[in-house]
From Swiss-Prot:
Enzyme class: isomerase
Reaction(s) catalysed by this chain's protein: an N-acyl-D-glucosamine 6-phosphate = an N-acyl-D-mannosamine 6-phosphate
GO MF term (any one): N-acylglucosamine-6-phosphate 2-epimerase activity
Source taxon at top rank: Bacteria
Keyword rRNA-binding found: no
Name this polypeptide is given: Putative N-acetylmannosamine-6-phosphate 2-epimerase
Family to which this protein belongs: Belongs to the NanE family.
Organism: Listeria monocytogenes serotype 4b (strain F2365)
Alphabetical list of InterPro entries matching this protein: Aldolase_TIM, NanE, RibuloseP-bd_barrel
CDD domains: NanE
Gene symbol of the encoding locus: nanE
Length: 231
């Protein structure tokens, strides 16, 4: 399955369809329709959160899905598919790719990322695994563990990379990521315009994930209203 999945997303746009509990569009049904609209617009893949949303989306579309499970724990800052339990739950949906936090930060219950990856590969040998990284150190770490894809998802969202943007300094961080691994790199995080999506692919990324700029109406509206307020 791996090679065919990779071919399907190569050079394309993956749309992240997520709405958390405190957001107006929080609904598996709504996310399934959001995903359908994204695919009709040309998306080659969908990134989705929770098994419930994923299953609803699977009933509407047939492109590859990057599945995650956002869950907060008191003893760790890691929240994207943080423990073996969440990784297993997402794998059980049958998604083609499962993404998880691959930073060097302490995980909930002191679980070890290497142990999680080794265990889950034995259970789901045909599933691809994507590393959501923040720093270059994370990239090296994820690469050494054998992740199938490296994502820049958490750049700007960890304590170490706070307030940074992937487009800063002419995409300098992304360029460093591309130099640091031979694995396919998925650009993700604060890619908020079509031109940025095109640029990251031109730089050599395997695919690009865009979320809020497409699927979060409140964020899109705020960008317009903030600009109008400058009058």
């Amino acid at each position: 399955m791996g090679n065919s999945v990779m071919e399907k997303i190569k050079g394309g746009l993956v749309v992240s369809c997520q709405a958390l509990e405190d957001e107006p569009l929080h609904s598996a049904f709504i996310m399934s329709k959001m995903a359908l609209a994204a695919v009709q617009g040309g998306a080659v893949g969908i990134r989705a959160n929770t098994a419930k949303d994923i299953r609803a989306i699977q009933s509407e579309i047939d492109v590859p899905i990057i599945g995650i499970y956002k869950k907060d724990y008191d003893d760790s800052d890691v929240f994207i598919t943080p423990t073996l339990e969440e990784v297993r739950e997402i794998c059980e949906t049958g998604v083609e790719i499962v993404a998880m936090d691959a930073t060097t930060r302490k995980r909930p219950h002191n679980e070890d990322l290497k142990d999680i990856l080794n265990a889950i590969r034995k259970e789901f040998p045909n599933t691809l695994f994507m590393a959501d990284t923040g720093s270059i150190e994370d990239v090296y770490y994820a690469d050494s563990l054998g992740f199938d894809l490296i994502g820049t998802t958490l750049y700007g969202y960890t304590e170490e990379t706070a307030n940074k943007n992937i487009s800063d300094d002419d995409f300098s961080h992304l360029k460093e990521v591309l130099k640091s691994t031979k694995r396919p790199v998925i650009a993700e995080g604060k890619i908020d315009s079509p031109s940025k999506a095109r640029q990251v692919l031109t730089l050599g990324c395997y695919a690009v994930v865009v979320g809020g700029a497409v699927t979060r109406p409140q964020e899109i509206t705020t960008r317009f209203t903030n600009e109008i307020k400058k009058i």
